[in-house]
Swiss-Prot record:
This is Hemoglobin cathodic subunit beta. It comes from the Eukaryota. This fish has two types of hemoglobin: one cathodic Hb and two major anodic Hbs. The cathodic Hb displays a small normal Bohr effect and a reverse Bohr effect in the presence and absence of phosphate respectively. In addition, the cathodic HB displays a large phosphate effect. Pfam families: Globin. Involved in oxygen transport from the gills to the various peripheral tissues. One of its GO terms (cellular component) is hemoglobin complex.
Length: 146
């Protein structure tokens, strides 16, 4: 993937505005609520029986932060995203048996959370670059499956 200097700047600037502790839990909670079948991967989290339970779930919030921190690795390694996520892709494929489409669902939910949070600071041209970035990350995480 080729990144223009403008795209790199857009991703870097947006990432600099993201509060991992806030956005990560919101994005993961949204996945679990909007796509309830994804809850099957998180049995150890405890109660995920309602929206309130999901939003208030400390284990879910912690994992949401972990996921978003991992996304920061891609921001810092835009020239080698596939290499950055090789082991994580293998873990999700071979150990956790996660359906790789769930990475796309998470990316979509993260985009919704960012659009909600940043409003006018997340115009279509920023979203376009962000979507490209997320697509590359999803591809890298799905790599081990094929």
């Amino acid at each position: 993937v080729q990144w223009s200097s403008s795209e790199r700047s857009t991703i870097s600037t947006l990432w600099g505005k993201i509060n991992v502790a806030e956005i990560g839990p919101q994005a993961l909670a949204r996945v679990l609520i909007v796509y309830p079948w994804t809850q099957r991967y998180f049995g150890k989290f405890g109660d995920l029986s309602s929206v309130a339970a999901i939003v208030g779930n400390a284990n879910g919030a912690k994992h949401g932060r972990t996921v978003l921190q991992a996304l920061g690795q891609a921001v810092n390694n835009m020239d080698n995203i596939k290499g950055t996520y090789a082991k994580l892709s293998q873990k999700h494929s071979e150990e956790l048996n996660v359906d790789p489409d769930n990475f796309r669902l998470l990316g979509d939910c993260l985009t919704v959370v960012l659009a909600t949070k940043f409003g006018a600071e997340f115009p279509p041209e920023v979203q376009a670059v962000w979507q490209k970035f997320v697509a590359v990350v999803v591809s890298a995480l799905s790599r081990q499956y094929f």
